[in-house]
Amino acid sequence: QMGLGSLNTVATQAPANLTIVCIDNGTHGETGGQEGHTAQRTNLAMIAQGSGIPSVKEITSADQIADAHDFIRNQPGPRFLWCRVLPGDPTAFKRNFNPAECRIAFRNAYLGA
């Protein structure tokens, strides 16, 4: 979970090699599936842009994945990619909260390793 202040910090520090990927189903799935703010009016892309993140993109369907890939590879960083997905049932397994392991798993999935 990332607080909104993190976007301000990223914009201020401006790491060119950073992409924040926010996968948002509009719900709080782990606490019962209540609707979150983004299910209504909160627009994370506008918040990221207002924080000073230079490259911001929102995708809402699987056919935009190639565009998202191009965005990550070609736009100046830091980048914020807001992936809006459909809500679903919570996973039946416990999540891994180890940041190093999550980073490696995400990188391997992204690179097709």
Sequence positions of predicted segments:
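Short, hinge-like loop/turn segments at secondary-structure boundaries
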Residues: 11, 36-40, 74-75, 98-100
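Glycine/aspartate-rich loop-and-adjacent alpha/beta segment that forms the canonical ThDP
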Residues: 74-113
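Thiamine diphosphate
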Residues: 1-24
